Amino acid sequence: MYSGLNTIWVLLGAALVFFMQAGFSMCEAGFTRAKNTGNILMKNLMDFCIGTPCFWLIGFGIMFGAGNSVIGWLDPGIVKDYGHILPSGVPLWAFAIFQTVFCATSATIVSGAMAERTKFSAYCIYSACISLLIYPISGHWIWGGGWLSQMGFHDFAGSTAVHMVGGVCALIGAKMLGPRIGKYGKDGRPRAILGHNLTFAALGVFILWFCWFGFNGASTVAMDSDAAVTSAGLIFFNTNLAAAVACCVTLIFTWIRYGKPDVSMTYNAALAGLVGITAGCDAVSPLGSAIMGAVFGVVIVLAVEFFDKVARIDDPVGAISVHGVCGALGTVMTGLFATGISTEKGLFYGGGFHFLGVQSLGVVSVAAYVAVIITIVFSILKKTIGLRVDAEEEIAGLDVTEHGLLTAYAGFAMSPDTITDDSTPVAVAGETPVAEAIPVKKVPAFTDGSPKFTKIEVICKEARLDALKNAMTAIGITGMTVSHVLGCGVQKGKPEYYRGIPVEATLLPKVQVDIVVSKVPVRTVVETAKKVLYTGHIGDGKIFVYDVENVVKVRTGEEGYAALQDD
């Protein structure tokens, strides 16, 4: 007898977990460069589309079949009886789609850590391998009646089964792939490669946070009893609390560590809290959830810094730290904070070391298994079709080289990519003999007694543009050209950080005002501009003065002073 309430609950959860693909897409696109956006979105689409038939044909049977404690059975198309594993009142196909979207989540985690330099063909193949074998076998150990579940291992919604599996694959993949071009200087120090759209990343975080209520909440797979309803309420509350506390702690920690609260790290902290609490959201109290969230908030920062600076593993989005490290840590910490309502009591609640030991064993076992299998997969790909694109393709961007897509932002001007490989030695200019030097011809600005033309170029803050225009009008300047530019000075100010790495050069928005004068004294223009722009702070601007040989008005053909006059 099926339960309509339970089935709707499971299907609603499946829909929410499916929509996490949109959240992952936005996060990964925002944390990476614009030239790879189309590739990122394509990968997140295809790992789901490839993973779905793979899990249907092979993965589901391996994961939930009643084979043995290590592996299920081979059941192409899901045609056998799964009554031994189905939740009460939930039909097979509802349970199957719920598990399919979980499998796709694990596969998509890898995309971010290997972004911007992976061959699309290789990505499609290893995504299939994750859905066919890697995720289902470890999932059988945990959720399919395998040896870990028989020992009492508790991973309620997948801190280890989903997230750590994806995180370990991401770790091995990013290590074997190598860092992006320009990520590390010749001295080995990491360089900040800024994400192109943190607005996208923020939207992705909110989508994921919203969908996580389905990811964790619907894992009760029931809502037809007081116990199930009570458990769902606790799960929702703990899920939200851990993420919120993690964000607050990361904000404070980065504020102290870097001098300012780090935006991208705080985004990562939200996901770290969600990932970490997933294993024990049904088993810990709100106090335990808050403490765990605080730990995740500190650990995520230290983990990102470790992989960037010590391990030198280039992870553009922090997937290894968020899903791998915090997924493992959250599973182990469940062995500390479990209150006994749905599992054994944790160490801090008088349960002793047994449950903590089981949790730790499960994490280590799954990590080791996944690391071995995915290393084999990546090694085969590397030796055959190749894992990484060529340097020229990487520099040009994967949108155009992998997909023939000129840009994902048609109609928008894109900022040039200024990160390059500085490992190639640069030729040092030496002295040239006088006999070989190019002759310098000095031409006087004016030779016929005509008026002198001078170009005055003013670089200033955008906020001072109106004041400058008004001041120029007041002294008789009626023509100017205004350009929006990016730039930075040579002065050394307070360092800025992106994901814990000092940003080498920050290009700030400025305006460039070009004025050509003849009768208005140059000194008057310069002094007026100085008076208007001066604040006494770094960044007031610069004024450049040039001689102009001639001026030509295109429409009339007039030259010299006449070309400067209004009609």
Q: Which residues fall in each region the model found?
A:
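Glycine- and aromatic-enriched membrane alpha-helices
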Residues: M1-F446
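Positively charged, small/polar-rich N-terminal and surface patches that mediate targeting and assembly
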Residues: T401-L406, I419-D567
